[in-house]
From Swiss-Prot:
Pfam families xrefs: HATPase_c_3, HSP90
UniProt keyword terms in alphabetical order: ATP-binding, Chaperone, Cytoplasm, Nucleotide-binding, Stress response
Region (A), start-end ranges: 1-334
UniProt lineage: Bacteria, Pseudomonadati, Pseudomonadota, Alphaproteobacteria, Rickettsiales
Protein name: Chaperone protein HtpG
Cellular localisation: Cytoplasm
Length: 637
């Protein structure tokens, strides 16, 4: 350890203290993770210097063999991890180790407080970039000595994790470029100065790190602990399942095994290699707006970035792994990556390949595909909302699977649906809702189910968006059943025999009574509805809401109101079922006695019922309750 001068004691940022406490006490069952995090940080430091040296060769000063060296002092119970990467100066040490300078700190604290599993905590540690502090799980004191590339003065940072740290200048100006971390281990953590224990941890977590990891033995010799080659440079046959598992865990920071592996070497107009994984477990922050892509971009095995590059679209953000291209210049700036034509071509190729593999899996093993769909189906459908050409949208829809009124709990494709369409049926019908159980009970489905017409059941929030963007599939229009009342008139030949018989029994007098009641209902409900009509879709329920063709979907309108993007609530059409006992008696009563207060109350109650079934808020809950009470009083008189 170097002698120091000009020492200054500083306090940790307040949030760091909280993170330290939580990390130390949350990972006590999985302490190995500290070494993985420190090695990962060392690798990042080498990546950064390698990247910076592309535009400034003087930074590496002839030392181009990047490496990470681990050594121990068993007598003093100390563990050392050193690298010859970018290094840090005084301000870097304060910024990187004394504060957490990103907005996700509080989210990390909230998330880790709510996480119960050890593996879940490990995932959080990696995701929020606070892995350095895990060193305090095993160390009573941590000392960081570092000299930044291109600078002559080195600095020391040391702390016991007690809320303070000391920054000093290294007296010896000969400290090598890079960083050396000294862990003064706690007495009970002496296992971490054992060479075999260290080797096991490196093999488990850091075997495929981009730089050689050495162990400095008692003879002063460096023994290599990790792989010679980047795993993605090997052929598919050369990579074992265990190697995939190790690499997947190192890049994904999630538990479980990869659900799908996509390893391809593309040698066409654009040359690149991709090694991508789809996890079998859904990440905790999949839907967080700040979630970034977890696919790293390399150029000839030189790490470039994993931030701010849309090489993987947001709707494939569940992908983990790397893309390595030889068709990008090594000195490409991160800013120019955004509009790079090679990047765009790689993106299109990756999307096409992923969708193709997903479609194959869905066709060959729907039970296994269902696991993927339950984890990531709603994310994949986000792509349907994006601006894309028809070919890509059709491919994306081909990979989608849906529940339907005919499929119980199994999933179907739109191709399956089209093959089963009834004679005279021109549309793919769908209905959106909150969950499968409630949507299957919707009155909107009754007329379709009674005719044997299949309806796609959509239960993800994103479904309300993409169904407003996608109008057809394979030139077959998509149509919400809420707008499809008139369609059922054309499909009357599909009615069940008893329904056909009932239709034939209708006489002109009954039609006049119904028409008169409809006019009365319009008069009573007035501005609360845009119209009242006899439903062609209801068979068991008395009423439902409907919207006219060209009108906004009910659920979509409600979402926009909740997001303050709409400041009005449109009126809906009330559909009535004259064959339902309640409505039938109301029609007869109006025909015999004319309007009265009870009928008035009943109409308002039926409108309220229709609104509730569609998830709409009642305009006046107090009036609804009062009308309900008045009707109940009449019942018991």
């Amino acid at each position: 350890m170097q002698d120091v001068v000009n020492s200054e004691k500083l306090k940790f940022d307040a949030e760091v203290g909280k993170v330290l406490k939580l990390v130390i006490h949350s990972l006590y069952t999985n302490k190995d993770i500290f070494l993985r995090e420190l090695i990962s940080n060392a690798s990042d430091a080498c990546d950064k210097l390698r990247y910076e040296s592309l535009s400034n060769q003087d930074l590496i000063d002839g030392d181009t063999d990047f490496k990470i060296v681990i050594s121990v002092d068993q007598d003093k119970n100390r563990l050392y991890i050193s690298d010859n990467g970018i290094g840090m100066n005084r301000q870097d040490l304060i910024d990187n180790l004394g504060t957490i300078a990103h907005s996700g700190t509080q989210r990390f604290l909230d998330a880790i407080n709510n996480e119960t599993s050890s593996q879940g905590v490990v995932e959080l540690i990696g995701k929020f970039g606070v892995g350095f502090y895990s060193a305090f799980m095993v160390a009573s004191e941590v000392i960081v000595e570092s000299r930044k590339a291109g600078e002559s003065i080195g600095y020391q940072w040391r702390s016991a994790g007690d809320g303070e740290f000391i920054i000093s200048q290294l007296e010896d100006g000969q400290f090598p470029r890079g960083t050396k971390i000294t862990l003064i281990l706690k007495t009970e953590e002496s296992e971490f100065v054992d060479k075999f224990r260290i080797e096991h941890i490196v093999t488990t977590y850091s075997y495929h790190i981009n730089y050689p990891v050495y162990f400095l033995n008692d003879a002063g010799e460096e023994e290599k602990l990790n792989s010679d080659a980047a795993i993605w440079t090997k052929s598919k046959d050369e990579i074992s399942a265990q190697e995939h598992q190790n690499f997947f865990r190192s890049v994904a920071h999630v538990g479980g095994e990869p659900w799908m592996i996509l390893h391809n070497k593309n040698e066409g107009v654009i040359e690149y290699t991709n090694l991508l994984y789809i996890p079998s477990i859904k990440p905790f922050d999949l839907f967080h707006p700040d979630r970034k892509c977890s696919v790293k971009l390399y150029v000839n095995k030189v790490f470039i970035t994993e931030d701010n590059v849309q090489i993987i679209p947001q709707y494939l953000r569940f992908l983990k792994g790397i893309i390595d291209s030889s068709d990008l210049p090594l000195n490409i700036s991160r800013e120019t990556l955004q509009n790079n034509k090679v990047i765009e071509k790689i993106k299109q190729s990756i999307v096409k390949r992923v969708l193709s593999e997903l479609k194959k899996k869905a066709e060959n093993d729907i039970n296994d595909y269902k696991k993927f769909w339950e984890n990531f189906g709603s994310v994949l459908k986000e792509g349907l909302c994006e601006s894309m050409n028809t070919e890509f949208r059709e491919e994306l829809l081909s990979a989608c699977r849906f529940y339907s009124t005919n499929s119980d709990d199994s999933l179907i494709s739109l191709e399956d649906y089209i093959e089963r369409m009834k004679e005279g049926q021109d549309n793919i019908y769908y209905l959106t809702g909150n969950d499968l159980d409630s949507i299957k009970k919707s009155p909107q489905l009754e007329g379709f189910v009674s005719r044997g017409i299949e309806v796609i059941l959509l239960i993800d929030p994103v479904d309300d968006f993409w169904t407003n963007v996608v109008t057809d599939y394979q030139r077959v229009p998509l149509k919400s059943v809420i707008r499809a009342d008139e369609d059922l008139e054309k499909l009357a030949h599909l009615k069940k025999d008893e329904e056909v018989g009932e239709s034939k029994d209708e006489n002109p007098d009954s039609k006049e009574k119904v028409d008169a009641f409809v006019k009365y209902a319009i008069q009573v409900l007035d501005k609360l509805v845009s119209g009242v009509r006899v439903s062609k879709k209801l068979t068991n329920s008395p009423v439902c809401l409907a919207v006219a063709d060209g009108s906004m979907d009910i659920r979509m309108e409600r979402f926009l109101r909740e997001q303050k993007q709409l400041n009005y609530k449109s009126t809906k059409i009330l559909e009535i079922n004259p064959k339902h006992p309640i409505v039938s008696r109301m029609i007869d009563e109006y025909a015999n006695t004319g309007e009265n207060a009870v009928l008035d109350n009943m109409l308002h109650l039926l409108l309220g019922q229709a609104c509730i079934l569609e998830g709409e808020e009642l305009e006046d809950v107090s009036s609804f309750a009062e009308r309900m009470n008045n009707v109940l009083v009449k019942v018991y008189q």
